[in-house]
Curated annotation (Swiss-Prot):
SUPFAM superfamilies: beta and beta-prime subunits of DNA dependent RNA-polymerase (SSF64484). Its EC number is 2.7.7.6. It comes from Tolumonas auensis (strain DSM 9187 / NBRC 110442 / TA 4). This is DNA-directed RNA polymerase subunit beta. The gene is rpoB. One of its GO terms (biological process) is DNA-templated transcription. HAMAP family: RNApol_bact_RpoB (MF_01321). It comes from the Bacteria.
Length: 1342
């Protein structure tokens, strides 16, 4: 049952069959949680600012006599609040203050003797703060930091898919990726030698790195190979027999066991032979000496008598060598066990091409590769190698990297050091060799277990650390210089590098983006966006198909539908609805536990890696009343594949059918009936919908509308329950419920609303209250609607009555025919607010001045300006009008004697200033709704600035006074009830002044204390009010902090009302987009037998080939929903009984849907029912959740209940002839959006204007006031017509024949309409370019 007060006003009928196990999570948590983690001091020091400080501090001087230690940090209060920052164009940030301790050690005394300790708090720059809605205000504009999907640190094994070598041989490689530090790659070449690369440089044999780690040849061989032991006995050679090793080999001699020949010479050894040998239990067999020749020695063999090396490790044995061994008294020797199949001799081969023999040579070789051209020294080489992978300052795998590294190498524990160890490198090589030997598989780098999310907090921390490292260098320098006794921590730290790093990240990083603020959905989607681009990510050009493609692990984590079209497709994704990141940054999605075929309500979040181990059923599996899976075979997913399994084998089940898709896709009703390409366009176009003048909830929704509207932060949501005490257009006051009060608090919540402000996309942000005085509200109730919301539900467009039929070719190729009624009723009218600013600077020739005294400008042009030269609020302006008058000093020109004389007589003339006023751009018209004036400190404010200041002060005082009065009333109300409860009569109190109430004395000691507490609260409130007002006053009065050289900034805000017109782009939610071709008079539109005309006529041919059938179902369901509303409306007009209305509503809400979501009308009070009925008269809102929506039968039932034809088709009549069309037409209600591609912004014309410098052709594009390009194809068209003279004119005088242009102008002035075409400038450019190639080319006249 619906419980919130707002929802009761208009209950959406839900067709969903599955009950909701998990509430939709808070949609912005990925941003807010990540940044909170960054700012909160983590006692472990594992993440956030704390981690950055701990990783850089303590900083020790080079000599070790001083150390700067980090103690703690705190964030101060921001100077301005979010709104003030946006108006003033500054960053919303807080100062960071860090407590540092400088410890000085005594040089002479024993090491570690402390001489002096100084502790001090140091300012370390400003940290931008996140607003409550997950955005940052940087230089006055709202920005979003998009999360990044990057390759997780760890170790990855891969191959080149046979592309590197011409033979098509698959070459395997391994790569160790740290969180920061050098990459380490191992790779095979076509000859099966193993190489190593550091940071993708020149490759070296892989054994070099082992030698650098102090391995000898013998140790390398015993680490990587199994050995075969041979024994020399009585002149015979006996081999240790390990039967398993012989499988698949061909016997080169008879293998004898117990006198029987088990395998004859030349036969392949099979599993049967091996079983016989194992049965015989032989441990050694005799082999011919030739069998041993050519095997590789595993050890160095040194002659005990002479001490000389007889056989080096990794050399092939010869007959002579074996004889020598025997002579020298060696009874046993070992060789490497290799074979072609699964024990390759790769390391042994690699050792042969490795020129280094000891550690130093290996280090020098690595040094030469990393620093070519520098002479290596022993220390430098050792230092370099040490710093590459074994120094915590330069290399960090991070906890994630270590976890991934250890789990890939199948180690039991997942924690360890952030640097590499000797074992790590050896294990990676072993694993790579095992993969090359066919014992393991390569990784899939597009698997979401190998890609992790880096969110705001983590990226900010990395940037902060970069700044700190820069500071560390400077501190070390300072510590080694000069007198340490006089130095304070403050003197050591320069906050500039830190501020610069942080500022650069928030201001200009690729992932810090200008927020898409078209509507609430575009905001929420932008904050939930996951990009694979950006620093440390992919680039558009290099990303192949695999990275962009949908991967099985995307299920429930990233949306398979919502991604941009074009070059970024698949690189920018959107989080799925229920998805979240785990502690390591991998995406998880929730599943319900299934035990023995019974579904429980226990929910587990699984990451992509964990998910692979389980069998997971879909959310729409059939379930009986006991929550037991019904079917014998159930479709499910296991290890990334879809299969069928028995109920008992199933371990988990999806939480909800919509967990696959993102927020935008989950707002498309009947998504399951749309083709994926169109769904992609649908989810992208919803983000471009412009908020209409009056928001209209969708009749056919999906049930996600409320979550989006509330979570996006455009609505005002109650923080606590209570009763509405006061409402006007700009504030709502709630009297809080007694049980939700904090001790000693006034119990009043005041919500201020945003009025007519500009969004990033120039749309209008305005909040309207949707509650009235006396209404009860609960925590989380919507109190005021924002842009594109209607009663707390997302409302991006309008419900339009549409007909699918051709209409005189006006809906050819997706064009849309719209009725004039839509324009008259302002259904698709939008308000756009533009900000124009005028800056007065201090120039070399003197200051610019804002004034109404502008040279050579008539009275008419100044009519809209006040005496300060600034336009009035409320003035209606059009292109070319002056908004702010400004004059700029001109350079002194040489005056003629005559002018000097005139000057002397008439005083200064206005010739030394030029007009540089702010004018309205061409093609823009609108009303001035606000003017802001910012004046630099120390510059006198003009009259207008003072007026603005006075108004702000008045408003601030009024706001605070009202706020104070409300809170004061609350305090007196409590005092009054306390006094009345203690025997004071109403009359007695009404005679006393209110302030005297607080001075009364009561008999009850406890009550007296309570009254005194109330009196104290009143005093505190008064002081708080005075303090707040003073702070506000100071902020308003003080000069503004403007950029250097700027004296004044005037910002003018224009509101433009845009009605719908031909050329505007509209769309439905199913990717069905089109451009308006004609606004048709109402009387010409097709109408039904009741005389109701349709609003929009769409082309039926737009449906079959696009395969977005969802729009047809939406239209049918919309017709039914509207029909129910009309029926309720008729019942109200006929003044039917409330009981009858209740009964009808109950029938409507009971139709279809699940038992869990039933709505019991009987539980609503009469007033509630009246409100509900009033809100349903325009149509019954229905929800058809994604993949769990209304069935065809249910739509038909609802149509029947609404007295509409079940086919959804009706006979229409031609508005012009009055004749019926020859067959029935599908008519219904579709939710249509007006997209932010308005013809007003695109239409553009030019006659003359600026020209390109080199080619002298007109510029292109509206922004440059360019011309229309007469391109190659247009030239062909004129050629085809044989219109030679027209063509000549187009390519010469109308384009870039400079002399021809000026001559033609002169001719026209003289009244002679002839033209003389000359040589186009671009031809001259071509000549010059050919000459630049050294070819002389000249035009000779005949």
């Amino acid at each position: 049952m619906v419980n919130s007060y707002t929802e009761k006003k208009r209950i959406r009928k839900d067709f969903g069959k599955r009950d909701q196990v998990l509430e939709t999570p808070y949609l912005l948590s990925i941003q807010l949680d990540s940044f909170k983690q960054f700012l909160d001091a983590d006692p472990e020091g594992a993440y956030g600012l704390e981690a950055a400080f701990r990783s850089v501090f303590p900083i020790t001087s080079y000599s070790g006599t001083a150390e700067l230690q980090y103690v703690s940090y705190r964030l101060g209060e921001p100077v301005f609040d979010v709104k003030e920052c946006q108006i003033r164009g500054v960053t919303y940030s807080a100062p960071l203050r860090v407590k540092l301790r400088l410890v000085l050690f005594d040089k002479e005394a024993a090491a570690g003797t402390v001489k002096e300790i100084k502790e001090q708090e140091v300012y370390m720059g400003e940290i931008p703060l996140m607003t409550d809605n997950g955005t940052f205000v940087i230089n006055g504009t709202e920005r979003v930091i998009v999360s990044q999907l990057h390759r997780s640190p760890g170790v990855f094994f891969d191959h080149d898919k046979g592309k590197t070598h011409s033979s098509g041989k698959v070459l395997y490689n391994a790569r160790v990726i740290p969180y920061r530090g050098s990459w380490l790659d191992f790779e095979f070449d076509a000859k099966d030698n193993l190489f190593v690369r550091i940071d993708r440089r020149r490759k070296l044999p892989a054994t070099i790195i082992l030698r650098a780690l102090e391995f000898t040849t013998e140790e390398i061989l015993t680490t990587f190979f199994e050995t075969i032991k041979f024994e020399i006995k009585d002149g015979k050679v006996l081999m240790e027999l390990v039967p398993e090793r012989l499988r698949g080999e061909t016997a080169t001699f008879d293998i004898v066991a117990g006198g029987d020949v088990v395998v004859e010479k030349g036969r392949r050894i099979t599993a049967r032979h091996i079983r016989q040998l194992e049965k015989a239990g032989i441990s050694q067999i005799e082999v011919p000496v030739e069998y041993v020749v050519g095997k590789i020695s595993a050890r160095d063999y040194v002659n005990p008598q002479t001490g000389e090396v007889m056989i080096n490790a990794n050399t092939a044995l010869s007959l002579e060598a074996i004889a020598n061994l025997s002579q020298a008294g060696f009874k046993q020797f070992e060789v490497l066990f290799t074979n072609e199949l699964d024990h390759g001799s790769y390391i042994s081969e690699t050792l042969r091409i490795d020129s280094s023999t000891n550690r130093l040579e290996a280090l020098v070789e690595i040094y030469r590769m990393m620093r070519p051209g520098e002479p290596p020294t022993k220390d430098a080489a050792e230092q370099l190698f040490e710093n590459l992978f074994f120094s915590a300052d330069r290399y960090d795998l991070s906890t994630v990297g270590r976890m991934k590294f250890n789990s890939r190498l199948a180690r039991p524990d997942h924690i360890g050091s952030g640097i590499l160890s000797q074992d790590d490198i050896v294990d990676v090589m072993k694993q790579l060799i095992a993969i090359r030997n066919g014992k393991d598989d390569v990784d899939d780098i597009d698997h979401l277990g190998n890609r992790r999310i880096r969110s705001v907090g983590e990226m900010a921390e990395n940037q902060f650390r970069v700044g700190l490292v820069r500071v560390e260098r400077a501190v070390k320098e300072r510590l080694s210089l000069g007198d340490l006794d006089a130095i304070q921590p403050q003197d050591l730290i320069n906050a500039k590098p830190i501020s610069a790093a942080v500022k650069e990240f928030f201001g200009s990083s690729q992932l810090s983006q200008f927020m898409d603020q078209n509507n609430p959905l575009s905001e929420i989607t932008h904050k939930r966006r996951i990009s694979a681009l950006g620093p440390g990510g992919l680039t558009r050009e290099r990303a192949g198909f695999e990275v962009r493609d949908v991967h099985p692990t995307h299920y429930g984590r990233l949306c398979p539908i919502e991604t941009p079209e074009g070059p970024n497709i698949g690189l920018i994704n959107s989080l799925a609805v229920y998805s979240r990141t785990n502690e390591y940054g991998f995406l998880e999605t929730p599943y319900r536990k299934v035990i023995d075929g019974v579904i429980t309500d226990e929910v587990d979040y699984l990451s992509a890696i964990e998910e692979g181990n389980f069998v997971i059923a879909q959310a729409n599996a059939n379930v009986d009343a006991d929550a037991r899976l019904k079917d014998e075979l159930i479709p499910c997913r296991h290890k990334g594949e879809s299969t069928f399994m028995n109920a008992e084998q199933i371990q988990y089940m999806d939480v909800s059918p919509q967990q696959v898709v993102s927020v935008a896709a989950s707002l498309i009703p009947f998504l399951e009936h749309d083709d994926a390409n169109r769904a992609l366009m649908g989810s992208n176009m919803q983000r471009q919908a412009v908020p209409t003048l009056r928001a209209d909830k969708p009749l056919v929704g999906t049930g996600m509308e409320r979550a989006v509207a509330v979570d996006s932060g455009v609505t005002v949501v109650a923080k606590r329950g209570g009763t509405i005490d006061y409402v006007d257009a700009s504030r709502i006051v709630v009297k809080v419920n007694e049980d939700e009060l904090l001790p000693g608090e006034a119990g009043i919540d005041i919500y201020n609303l945003t009025k007519y402000t500009r969004s990033n996309q120039n749309t209008c942000i305005n909040q309207r209250p949707c509650v009235s005085v006396g209404e009860p509200v609960m925590l989380g109730d919507v109190l005021a609607d924002g842009p594109s919301t209607d009663l707390g539900e997302l409302a991006l467009g309008q419900n339009m009555r549409v007909a699918f039929m051709p209409w005189n070719g006006y809906n050819f190729e997706d064009s849309i025919l719209v009725s004039e009624r839509v324009v008259q009723e302002d259904r698709l009218t939008t308000i756009h607010i533009q900000e124009l600013s005028c800056i007065a600077r201090d120039t070399k020739l003197g200051p610019e001045e804002i004034t109404a005294d502008i040279p050579n400008v008539g009275e008419a042009a100044l009519s809209k300006l006040d005496e300060s030269g600034i336009v009035y609020v409320g003035a209606e302006v059009k292109g070319g009008d002056i908004l702010v008058g400004k004059v700029t000093p001109k350079g002194e020109t040489q005056l003629t004697p005559e002018e000097k004389l005139l000057r002397a007589i008439f005083g200064e003339k206005a010739s030394d200033v030029k007009d540089s006023s702010l004018r309205v751009p061409n093609g823009v018209y609108g009303t001035v709704i606000d003017v802001q004036v910012f004046t630099r400190d120390g510059v006198e404010k003009d009259k207008r600035a003072k007026e603005v200041e006075d108004m702000q002060l008045r408003d601030a005082k009024k706001d605070l006074t009202e706020e104070f009065k409300i809170l004061e009333d609350g305090i007196f109300g409590r005092a009054r009830s306390l006094l009345i409860a203690n025997g004071f009569g109403e009359d007695r109190l009404s005679k006393l002044d209110r302030k005297r109430w607080l001075e009364q004395s009561l008999d009850d000691e406890g009550k007296q204390v309570e009254l005194e507490q109330i009196a104290e609260q009143h005093i505190a409130l008064k002081e708080e009010f005075d303090r707040k007002f003073e702070a506000k006053r100071q902020k308003i009065i003080q000069g503004d902090d403007l950029a250097p050289g700027v004296l004044k900034i005037v910002k003018v805000y224009l509101a433009v009302k845009r009605r719908i017109q031909p050329g505007d782009k509209m769309a439905g939610r199913h990717g069905n987009k089109g451009v308006i071709s004609k606004i048709c008079p109402v009387e010409d539109m097709p109408y039904d037998d009741e005389g109701n005309p349709v609003d929009i006529v769409l082309n039926p041919l737009g449906v079959p080939s696009r395969m977005n059938i969802g729009q047809i179902l939406e239209v049918h369901l919309g017709l039914a929903a509207k029909g129910i509303g009309e029926k309720i409306d008729r019942m109200v007009k006929e003044q039917r009984e409330l009981a009858e209305l209740r009964e009808f509503l109950q029938r409507v809400y009971d139709l279809g849907g699940s038992d869990q979501q039933q709505i019991d009308i009987a539980t609503l009070s009469d007033d509630d029912v009246r409100t509900l009925v009033q809100n349903l008269r325009k149509g019954l809102p229905v929800a058809t959740p994604v993949f769990d929506g209304a069935k065809e039968s249910e739509i038909k039932e609802l149509l029947k209940l609404a007295d509409k034809p079940e086919s959804g088709q009706i006979t229409l009549f031609d508005g012009r002839t009055g004749m019926p069309f020859e067959r029935v037409v599908t008519v219904g209600y579709m939710y249509m959006l007006k997209l932010n591609h308005l013809v007003d912004d695109k239409m553009h014309a030019r006659s003359t204007g600026s020209y390109s410098l080199v080619t002298q052709q007109p510029l292109g594009g509206k922004a440059q006031f360019g011309g229309q390009r007469f391109g190659e194809m247009e030239v062909w068209a004129l050629e085809a017509y044989g219109a030679a003279y027209t063509l000549q004119e187009m390519l010469t005088v109308k384009s870039d024949d400079v002399n021809g242009r000026t001559k033609m102008y002169k001719n026209i002035v003289d009244g002679d309409h002839r033209m003389e075409p000359g040589i186009p400038e671009s031809f001259n450019v071509l000549l010059k370019e050919i000459r630049s190639l050294g070819i002389n080319i000249e035009l000779e006249e005949e």
